[in-house]
A protein has these predicted regions:
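The feature marks the mature, well-folded catalytic cores of soluble enzymes
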Residues: 2-205
């Protein structure tokens, strides 16, 4: 068990041909935040282990392992392709706060890119750092000016060729205004696009 003491590298990755992975590309590992809905999560693990490695973040590894090996919700699961990692969590929604896979050169030099999460959930916001530590992959974080960027995975889709799709929420949550729990980063739309480009190789947003 390790404790994440800092966020990732807060400067752009040192590559000139960055490529953000597409939503539909083959994956090496599926990440799950074990927080509520245990029966559904167990079924996701069972359906995924024949396709890829499954990494389960949980606050109580022994309890999670016992549940995965138990008879409920489909029966015992073979854990040979499952990593159970102890990590503090706030919520289940790892799609929104998890890391983004980016390559420095097409399919090589893999890194992870992590944005500021758009919710007041500090444990969730550092899960990407825990993933990078577990896999031995560098994490680049948009958490420090002038590259501080707030975003959520549910508002992002990439095609793997330099184009990404976002709603205007990314503008609203980076306009420098205040909300009940934080003050947003302050960027123009052009500055937002520049951050996506230098961290993820996105040239069309």
């Amino acid at each position: 068990v390790s404790t994440v003491l800092s966020r990732g590298i807060e400067t752009p990755p040192p590559y000139t041909n960055l490529r953000a992975a597409a939503e539909w590309e083959e994956i090496e590992a599926l990440t799950i935040a074990w927080q509520g809905y245990p029966c559904i999560l167990k079924q996701i693990v069972a359906a995924s282990i024949s396709e890829c490695r499954v990494i389960v973040f949980t606050e109580n590894p022994s309890s999670t392992i016992n549940y995965l090996l138990g008879n409920s919700c489909g029966g015992s699961i073979d854990l040979d392709n499952v990593d159970v990692v102890e990590q503090e969590l706030n919520t289940i929604w790892i799609r929104d706060y998890g890391a983004n896979t980016v390559y420095g050169s097409w399919n090589d030099d893999r890194i992870l890119v992590d944005w500021m999460y758009n919710r007041p959930r500090p444990e969730d916001d550092v899960v990407s750092d825990a993933l990078g530590e577990h896999l031995g992959i560098d994490v680049y974080s948009t958490t420090a000016a002038p590259y501080n960027l707030m975003n959520t995975g549910g508002n992002y889709m990439s095609d793997g060729f330099g184009t990404a799709f976002e709603s205007e929420l990314v503008h609203d949550e980076n306009n420098g205004e205040s909300t009940w729990w934080t003050t947003y980063p302050n960027h123009t739309p052009t500055e937002i696009e520049d951050i996506f480009e230098v961290f993820m190789g996105i040239d069309t947003l």
